[in-house]
Amino acid sequence: MKKQESVLVGPSIMGADLTCLGVEAKKLEQAGSDFIHIDIMDGHFVPNLTFGPGIIAAINRSTDLFLEVHAMIYNPFEFIESFVRSGADRIIVHFEASEDIKELLSYIKKCGVQAGLAFSPDTSIEFLPSFLPFCDVVVLMSVYPGFTGQSFLPNTIEKIAFARHAIKTLGLKDSCLIEVDGGIDQQSAPLCRDAGADILVTASYLFEADSLAMEDKILLLRGENYGVK
C-alpha cells in the first residue's frame, strides 16, 4: 500500500445550514477548506432541486474561496455562462447529461473557468481516457447523485485506480486531477487517498455535530495530524 498523501478537501454547501449560507461559507473558509462545492440540481437529471446562479453569486460575495459548481442538470450548455457570471471557478458536468461532452468541456474552458467531467456510480468509465485531455478534473461519484447522507460505494476505489493509471499513461499527471464525491468520512478518505484521489468532496461528515471541530475533520480527511498547535 502506498503512503497516504495530503489531498484537497471541498465541503459541499448542500450539507450546511441553508438558512445562513453566507455565514456557513465564512465558517468553511476559517476552518481551512480548500474550496466550496455547490451542487446544482434540476429535479430531472436527479430527483431533487437545489440552487441556481443567484445562490452561487451570493456565496461568491461571502467568501474568497474557489467555487466549484457541480451541474447535475440536463441541457448544461444553457447555463454555463450564467454560472461563470455568478462566480464559478470550475464547472463540472455529467457524462450522462450530454451527447457532446468534448464540445461542452471545451466551451467551459473557453468561458475562462476550469472544466470537470463527472460519472455517476452505474456509468462505466471504460471511455474515460478519451475525455481526460479535455478535463481539469474527473469526478467519480461515490454515492448516487441527488441527496446527502449516503454511504460510500466501495467499487469507487477500483475506479480511482483506473483513472489514475489512465492519467499517468496519457502524461496528464500535472493537468488533470481525480475528485471523489460522496460518502467521504474518516473511514473512506484514506482508501481514496491510497487509490490515487487528489480531491475529496464531503458534506454530512463535515457538518454533523459531534466532538470533532470542523477544522480537525478537514485535517483528518487530508491525512494530516490535528490538534497540534
UniProtKB/Swiss-Prot annotation:
Transmembrane spans: none
Cofactor detail note: Binds 1 divalent metal cation per subunit.
Annotated positions binding a divalent metal cation: H37, D39, H70, D181
Keyword list, A-Z: Carbohydrate metabolism, Isomerase, Metal-binding
Xref: PROSITE patterns: RIBUL_P_3_EPIMER_1, RIBUL_P_3_EPIMER_2
Function: Catalyzes the reversible epimerization of D-ribulose 5-phosphate to D-xylulose 5-phosphate.
One annotated GO molecular function: metal ion binding
Metabolic or biological pathway, per its Swiss-Prot or TrEMBL entry: Carbohydrate degradation
Disulfide bond entries: none
Lineage, highest ranks first: Bacteria, Pseudomonadati, Chlamydiota, Chlamydiia, Chlamydiales
Cofactor: a divalent metal cation
Listed EC numbers: 5.1.3.1
InterPro entries xref list: Aldolase_TIM, Ribul_P_3_epim, Ribul_P_3_epim-like, RibuloseP-bd_barrel
NCBIfam families referenced in this protein's UniProt entry, alphabetically: PRK05581.1-4 (NF004076), rpe (TIGR01163)
Gene name in the database record: rpe
Protein name as catalogued: Ribulose-phosphate 3-epimerase
Catalytic activity field: D-ribulose 5-phosphate = D-xylulose 5-phosphate
GO biological process terms, semicolon-separated: pentose catabolic process; pentose-phosphate shunt
UniProt: substrate binding residues: S12, H70, G146, F147, T148, G149, D181, G182, G183, A203, S204
Catalytic residues of the enzyme: D39 (proton acceptor), D181 (proton donor)
Keyword Isomerase applies: yes
